[in-house]
C-alpha cells in the first residue's frame, strides 16, 4: 500500500494567474489565494465534486498584481505583497485593510510573518529586505551583504530557538540572516540560475530553494551547509514541505513533483489533464503550492487562473 495523490476538484474565481495560496489550522474550511487580477480571494471549501469551494469574499485594495499572501498564526489576519510596491495587513473578519506598509521603491515579491506574528519581512525588486512591525513601521532595511538582484522570496524559520530569515534572489544566492541583528549568517552558493522560491521545513532544521536551473537544493539551517540536490527537470516556481510527512513538493513548469526526502524518491508527479484542440498551446504552469494544515490536501495555483486540489489517498500501485 502506497500513498498517492488523487485529484479532487478545482476552485474557479480568479481572472489572473494564481500567485500564492495560504491555509490555516484555525479554519480548515477556508483558504486564501493571491492573484495577478489584483485581488485576494477568501474561499469557503465546500468539497463538492463540481466545485471544491466558492469565493466568499474578495480582498481589494492593491493597484497591481498581488505577489504573495500569508495568514497570521491565529488565523485572524492576512498579509499581502504587491507589484504596487506596498504590503497590506487585512482583517479577515471584516475583509478590510488595517495597515498599508509603504517603503519599498519597486514591486514587492514576497512577504512573511515571524512565528510570533510580531515581525514582518518583505523582499522586493528594489533588491532590499525590509523588517516591519505590525503597525506598518519599517524597523530595518537589510542592505549590507544583501542580494545584488531582485529578492524573490523571504521566509522566517518557524523555530523560535533559531531566529533566522531565509531569502533568495535573482543573483542565484540563498542567504540566511540572523534575526537578532539582521546580519548575514550564511551564503548558500550552488544554483546556476535565478531563484524563485525558498521554503523552510516545519521544524526549521532545513530549507529548500529552487528556480531557473530546475534543481531543488536542500540546505541544513543549523549547520549552514548544503545537504543534497533533487532534479526537478524544469523551472521551479514554488516549493513547499508537507506539514506531517517527510515530503517536499515542487511546482516544476506545468507539473508538480512530490519527493519523499527519506529515500529521495518521487512519490508522485501531478499533471493536470488539459484537453486542448491546439497542441502547440503552452500548458498552464503551476505557480503556487500550499498544503492544508493536516497535510491531507494539496492546493496548487496555475497560470490558467485555476486552483487545482489533490488529496493524499492510499493506493495499491
Swiss-Prot record:
Biological process per Gene Ontology, one example term: positive regulation of gastrulation
Keywords (A to Z) from UniProt: Cytoplasm, Repeat, Ribonucleoprotein, Ribosomal protein, WD repeat
Signal peptide: none
WD repeat boundaries on the chain: 13-44, 61-91, 103-133, 146-178, 190-220, 231-260, 281-311
GO molecular function: protein kinase C binding; ribosome binding; translation regulator activity
PROSITE patterns for the chain: WD_REPEATS_1, WD_REPEATS_2, WD_REPEATS_REGION
InterPro entries with a match to the protein in the record: G-protein_beta_WD-40_rep (IPR020472), RACK1-like (IPR045223), WD40/YVTN_repeat-like_dom_sf (IPR015943), WD40_repeat_CS (IPR019775), WD40_repeat_dom_sf (IPR036322), WD40_rpt (IPR001680)
Database matches in CDD domains: WD40
An example Gene Ontology CC term for this record: cytosol
Official protein name in the record: Small ribosomal subunit protein RACK1
